[in-house]
Regions:
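Long, charged amphipathic helices and adjacent flexible linkers at domain junctions
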Residues: 176-203, 395
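Conserved beta-loop-beta/alpha segment of the NTase-like Rossmann-fold superfamily
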Residues: 54-131
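Catalytic-core segments of class I nucleotidyltransferases/pyrophosphorylases
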Residues: 98-186
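Glycine-rich hexapeptide-repeat left-handed beta-helix
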Residues: 249-401
Length: 401
């Protein structure tokens, strides 16, 4: 049962910046802290930060969190109002800290707590803190915390540490390892397999379905969601994407996009933001997608750029296809219907539409719409000059004498 009705979190700033807004595995330390507390049932947050840090801090906490800066004229009143709305204990963190789930369990467990160096973590009754502040409004806040509450220490042995005071960026770097192992352990318990956990870097908000295998060199960031039975890696980076079930991503980068089930991506593919790749699609080697919709069962096997495009189902792209979407000022869209066949080395100069079932001949530069079930040929007629090379060689040899 959660023992904390709310949390007051300070984000101190020094000459090098605000340590709690520095990243631990791609997310600010404050976001890790907020996630740990929310998982334990803490619903109400009051964050004290520098005015310059407010915009960054807002992204780390729930939408209904309250924010106060030391210079706010009504800061004492807002603190009092926050405390008056709580019934029970409040957790107060006055220093940069990384708190694990196990650490929070120890903080909330009854009995003697581990002691060591100061952690900057306090627990106390919300009503008692409110009364003490009302009685002596000029007192230092941390003095009131020590007088009315209990500072919670941290174990001295590294292997047992669950509360990490972050005094500088070197300690922040050390905590990266702890955060990575905690994240991997959580995912393993949920049925995810790791070939080499020490080479996977996964942010705290990533969700992965059971049966998915994470290969070495994988980086997963942001609010990425990966389905069941996938194979990710080696050397894949995925940021803020939604990946379906049984998807393969091999040595590729995907950003802010959706990939439906049973699709394969890579190796060496680059999916840029705002793409929706359908199911049973092949996105092969050296393929780049940008701001495009790719229909089910389409194959883009190699050396192709598809940008600002709407592609139907069961389309085949030949090697070297380019959607020419930019004229130097404006981006234009390309539309390709179902069952179309795009020949190798085709340039599709947008805005242009290739109809359903239509073909483009290899080497064509398509500038006009192609009707359904038609063949477009846009290349020069081949001219063969017989014996031209032999004559040229003979002439060259004669000139050398």
């Amino acid at each position: 049962m959660n023992q904390f009705a709310g949390a007051i979190i300070f984000l101190p700033k020094d000459q090098t910046g605000t340590l709690m807004l520095e990243d631990i595995l791609f997310d600010p330390a404050a976001a890790w802290l907020a996630q740990t507390l929310r998982a334990a049932g803490v619903e109400r947050f009051l964050v004290v930060c520098h005015e310059d840090d407010r915009a960054a801090a807002v992204t780390c906490f729930p939408a209904d969190a309250s924010f106060v800066t030391p210079g706010d004229a009504d800061a004492p009143q807002r603190l009092s109002a926050f405390l008056d709305g709580l019934d029970g204990q409040v957790l107060v963190l006055t220093a940069p800290v990384f708190l694990t789930d196990a650490g929070l369990a120890k903080l909330t467990a009854p009995g003697k707590l581990p002691r060591g160096e100061s952690s900057g973590v306090f627990r106390l009754d919300a009503a008692a803190l409110s009364a003490a502040l009302a009685e002596d409004g000029s007192a230092e806040f941390e003095d009131v915390l020590r007088r009315c509450g209990e500072e919670l220490g941290e174990a001295s042995e590294w292997s047992y540490r669950t509360v990490f005071r972050l005094n500088d960026r070197t300690e922040l770097m050390d905590v990266q390892y702890v955060a990575r192992r905690l994240t991997v352990a959580r995912l393993v318990r949920q049925g995810v397999r790791f070939i080499d956990p020490d080479t996977a870097y996964i942010g705290p908000n990533v969700r992965i379905g059971k049966g998915t295998v994470i290969l070495p060199g994988t980086i997963l960031r942001g609010h990425t969601v990966i389905g069941e039975g996938c194979e990710i890696g080696p050397n894949a980076m995925i940021r803020d994407c939604r990946i379906g079930d049984r998807v393969t991503v091999n040595a590729s980068q995907l950003n802010e996009s959706v990939v439906d089930s049973e699709t394969s991506v890579g190796p060496f593919a680059y999916v840029r933001p705002n793409c929706h790749v359908g199911s049973h699609v092949k996105v092969g080697d050296f393929v780049e997608l940008k701001n495009s919709v790719i229909g089910d069962e389409t194959k883009i096997s190699h050396l192709t750029y598809v940008g600002d495009s709407d592609v139907g189902r069961h389309v085949n792209f030949g090697c070297g296809t380019v959607t020419v979407n930019y004229d130097g000022e404006t981006k234009f869209r390309t539309v390709i219907g179902d069952d179309a066949f795009i020949g190798c080395n085709t340039n599709l100069v947008a805005p242009v539409k290739v109809g359903g079932g239509a073909y483009t001949a290899a080497g064509s530069t398509i500038t006009d719409d192609v009707p359904d079930d038609s063949l477009a040929i846009a290349r020069s007629m081949q001219v063969v000059k017989k014996q031209w090379a032999a004559k040229r060689k003979k002439k060259s040899e004669k000139g050398m004498k």
